[in-house]
Curated annotation (Swiss-Prot):
It comes from the Eukaryota. SUPFAM superfamilies: WD40 repeat-like. This is Dynein axonemal intermediate chain 1. It is found in: Cytoplasm, Cytoskeleton, Cilium axoneme. Residues 136-155 have a biased composition (Acidic residues). GO terms for cellular component: 9+2 motile cilium; centrosome; cytoplasm; extracellular region; glial cell projection; microtubule; outer dynein arm. Keywords: Cell projection, Cilium, Cytoplasm, Cytoskeleton, Dynein, Microtubule, Motor protein, Phosphoprotein, Repeat, WD repeat. PROSITE patterns: WD_REPEATS_2 (PS50082), WD_REPEATS_REGION (PS50294). The gene is Dnai1. GO terms for biological process: determination of left/right symmetry; epithelial cilium movement involved in extracellular fluid movement; flagellated sperm motility; heart development; insulin receptor signaling pathway; outer dynein arm assembly. It holds the Pfam family WD40. Consists of at least two heavy chains and a number of intermediate and light chains. Interacts with BICD2. Interacts with CFAP45 and CFAP52. Interacts with CFAP53. It comes from Mus musculus. Part of the dynein complex of respiratory cilia. Residues 1-45, 119-165 are annotated as: Disordered.
Length: 701
């Protein structure tokens, strides 16, 4: 029966297969399968036809760790640069699966606490087991005792004991032992500040109201119109307030200023160290001055009290008494290129060091000496280029302007602790292309900005204004020699530029100034006219080294030159009033501040010449060698504004202080019954008297 069923099933299957083949319309031969028959492939009409080489070509696939879904163009705002910046690096991490685990590290605090709790639970379970085992042992021991008691009770009649009471006491003892837990040993935690957070409901702090009584703030009604004059008045009031505050600051004593500064500053470790050093330096300065005062006591006594008694026997001759000699090792073999007294502190003077030799240019030095300490300068500044000139501001005596050999100008602030100039010109700000031979402070401009002038060999007279934190330049005039235009092949004309060497501004006429050149000419110029000169003087045959207006007489000026001459001029006349030949190149001249007829000149042969036109208008009343003739050459001279002394500098970096004898500073003699007249009017009349004599002689000739 089973074999027949299997056949029927197979027959039915083959019949069903034949029916399917007939239905599909495919002819299948006997003994073959469907999969072995060939099938026709169908291709789309736009399919690419590739060659065998293209089909066999291998393409390498590179797997990268970059996230394909990461953004490519993220832009964020940069507060530093103030613009939107493209973010180049983007985090490429992609999270595929994350699961929060419940494993705790053994070394962590939570792991230690859990381990400690497990040990506590295990210890309590062991103690319970020990207590139960002891209780069972006690019960087993009591059972035979009870049997023995019953036998004895049965044997001994009449001897009955209180057995139930004893049983109750034993049960109570067992219960107490079972109920008393075994206390494990306390283990100290490694961190006693461990705590577990527990949530609890607490009552929030209730709001409290506090009230107080006070006077209401005052109220005012204000109304005004904003117009031009109201704004101007407000600015004027503000300016007055600022000036008052400045005056208060100036009126404060230096000790109070120092205490306020020390209170305002927050001292760091470095600042405290620097303050300690400054305190030590101040103390060292005081000690140094005391030592020098004792060392140079005889010189100080001569400076104050000594007068040459031999002048009583010499009517028209005087002498120079050497006092102090100033020198510094760092400025050794650097020529003294400039001298200037401080207008406020009469014992302080500034010295500029550089070199006049074109082939031996080196560094420069700015030194400020005090007569109280001749051994070492009070201030010292160094520069990469040689300093050729300097000037100290009249109203701000801590500001020193200097001119360099490389054409730059700079301003030094003596109040600043650092050794660099506060302001300096650059090639972008219009610096000179040749050495700067002289600088002069002038009055502030309309906006109260500091202003000074400079002259250079490039032929430019430049006005420099300190606006905020930079130097702004304006070319006042360019020196052009007359009749010096040359034509070049292209048809253009070239003007020969004059080389300025010295200049000086008029004391009363603000716009007028004189300029000396290397060609020996002196030009009278104006700040208002930049295209032409007011007048031209054929002064010298060689370069003009100095030009100076007389401090008393407004028409008289003096010039000196390398042609050995010193000339005194009236600016209204083109010929000189006085000419003096000193038999050597004249480096510098200076008017005396106490007389309109006294001036000094220094020559390269090491001599200092002092003239007094009221005593002798033909020759010097003092002609004295100051330095060694063969070794040193005197370059500059300056009178002290108050004391009867002069300072001279040489080309070796030495500065010598000399005292004028009484004959070199004679005052008008007293006449019987008349008071001695003093003042500028007397000095002007004294010089006018001499000039009138010269004018009369010239008119006669």
């Amino acid at each position: 029966m089973p074999s027949k069923q299997i056949r029927k099933q197979s027959i039915s299957v083959t019949r069903g297969a034949r029916r399917r083949d007939e239905d599909s319309g495919t002819d299948v031969g006997e003994g073959t399968d469907e999969w072995s028959q060939s099938k026709a492939t169908v291709r789309p009409p736009d399919q690419l036809e590739l060659t065998d080489a293209e089909l066999k070509e291998e393409f390498t696939r590179i797997l990268t760790a970059n996230n394909p879904h990461a953004p490519q163009n993220i832009v964020r705002y940069s507060f530093k640069e103030g613009t939107y910046k493209l973010i180049g690096f983007v985090n490429q991490m992609a999270v595929h699966f994350s699961q929060v685990g419940n494993l705790i590290p053994k070394d962590s605090d939570e792991g230690r606490r859990q381990h400690y709790r497990d040990e506590m639970v295990a210890g309590s379970q062991e103690s319970i087991k020990v207590v139960t085992s002891e209780a069972e042992n006690l019960e087993e021991e009591e059972e035979p005792k009870e049997g023995e008691g019953e036998a004895e009770a049965e044997a001994e009649a009449g001897s009955q004991t209180d057995i139930p009471a004893a049983a109750e006491t034993t049960e109570k003892v067992i219960e107490e032992e079972l109920m008393a837990p075994v206390q494990p040993k306390e283990r100290k935690l490694t961190n006693q500040f461990n705590f577990s957070e527990r949530a609890s409901q607490t009552f929030n702090n209730p709001l409290r109201d506090r009230e107080c009584q006070m006077e209401p703030p005052p109220r005012t009604n204000f109304s005004a119109t904003a117009n031009q004059w109201e704004i101007y008045d407000a600015y004027v009031d503000e300016l007055e307030k600022q000036e008052k505050t400045k005056e208060k600051e100036k009126a404060k004593t230096p000790v109070a200023k120092k205490t306020e500064k020390m209170a305002m500053r927050k001292l760091t470790s470095m600042e405290s160290q620097s303050d300690d050093i400054t305190k030590v330096t101040q103390a060292a300065k005081i000690v140094e001055r005391m030592v020098n005062q004792n060392t140079y006591d005889d010189v100080a006594q001569d400076f104050k009290y000594y007068e040459d008694t031999a002048d009583e026997y010499r009517d028209q001759e005087g002498t120079l008494l050497p006092l102090w000699k100033f020198q510094n090792d760092k400025a050794k073999r650097l020529a003294v290129t400039a001298l200037c007294w401080n207008p406020k502190y009469k014992d302080l003077f500034a010295v500029g060091h550089g070199s006049y030799d074109f082939m031996k240019q080196s560094r420069g030095m700015l030194l400020l000496y005090s007569m109280k300490n001749p051994s070492f300068p009070e201030y010292m500044f160094s520069s990469e280029s040689g300093i050729m000139c300097l000037d100290v501001h009249v109203d701000h005596p801590y500001l020193v302007v200097v001119g360099y050999y490389d054409g730059n100008v700079a301003i030094y602030n003596l109040k600043k602790p650092h050794s660099q100039p506060c302001f300096r010109s650059t090639s972008k700000s219009g610096k000179h292309t040749d050495p700067v031979w002289q600088v002069k402070w002038q009055k502030d401009d309309m906006d109260h900005n500091l202003n000074f002038f400079s002259v250079s060999s490039d032929g430019r007279i430049v006005s420099w204004t300190l606006v905020k934190s930079e130097l702004v330049h304006i070319d006042i005039i360019k020196l052009k020699t007359e009749g010096s235009t040359t034509e070049i092949p292209e048809g253009l004309q070239l003007h020969t530029v004059g080389c300025g060497t010295a200049f000086d501004f008029h004391k009363e006429i603000d716009y007028m100034f004189l300029v000396g050149t290397e060609e020996g000419k002196i030009y009278k110029c104006s700040k208002s006219y930049s295209s032409q000169f007011l007048d031209t003087y054929d002064a010298h045959n060689m370069a003009v080294d100095a030009v100076l207006w007389n401090p008393y007489h407004t028409k008289v000026f003096m010039s000196c030159s390398s042609d050995w001459t010193v000339k005194i001029w009236d600016h209204t006349i083109k010929t000189p009033m006085f000419i003096y030949d000193l038999n050597s190149a004249v480096g510098d001249v200076a008017w005396a501040p106490y007389s309109s007829t006294v001036f000094a000149a220094v020559t390269t042969d090491g001599k200092a010449h002092v003239f007094d036109l009221a005593v002798n208008k033909y020759e010097a009343i003092c002609n004295q060698p100051v330095v060694a003739k063969k070794k040193n050459k005197i370059t500059h001279v300056q009178f002290n504004p108050i004391h009867p002394i002069i300072i001279v500098g040489d080309d070796r970096g030495h500065i010598i202080c000399l005292k004028l004898s009484p004959n070199l500073r004679k005052m008008p003699k007293e006449k019987k019954g008349q008071e001695v007249q003093k003042g500028p009017a007397v000095e002007i009349a004294k010089l006018d008297k001499l000039l009138n004599l010269v004018r009369e002689v010239k008119t006669k000739t």
